[in-house]
């Protein structure tokens, strides 16, 4: 009986996690890791118009922004917290 109950719990957890959720780094340094909202299909790193040194912002997007340094569609693909 315990085995059946454990099996049902595991199957329920697996089924609840079937909805794909993209994870991206977001914001400016220090970057934060978040689970993107539903509908977000891309992670991107975009340049902000700053001088003299460029500043980059990372985030979740429904499609690639018009200006981007990196745009991708897998978990955490827009770089680590220590990268530009």
From Swiss-Prot:
Keyword Nucleotide-binding: no
Signal peptide: 1-21
Tissue: Expressed by the venom gland.
InterPro entries named among the record's database cross-references: Snake_toxin-like_sf (IPR045860)
Lineage: superkingdom: Eukaryota
Keywords associated with the record: Disulfide bond, Secreted, Signal, Toxin
SUPFAM superfamilies in alphabetical order: Snake toxin-like
Gene Ontology CC: extracellular region
Gene3D superfamilies, A to Z: CD59 (2.10.60.10)
Disulphide bonds in the chain: 24-43, 36-60, 64-71, 72-77
One MF term in the entry's GO annotations: toxin activity
Subcellular location, record wording: Secreted
Membership in a protein family: Belongs to the three-finger toxin family. Short-chain subfamily.
Protein name: Three-finger toxin MALT0070C
Source organism of the structure: Micrurus altirostris (Uruguayan coral snake)
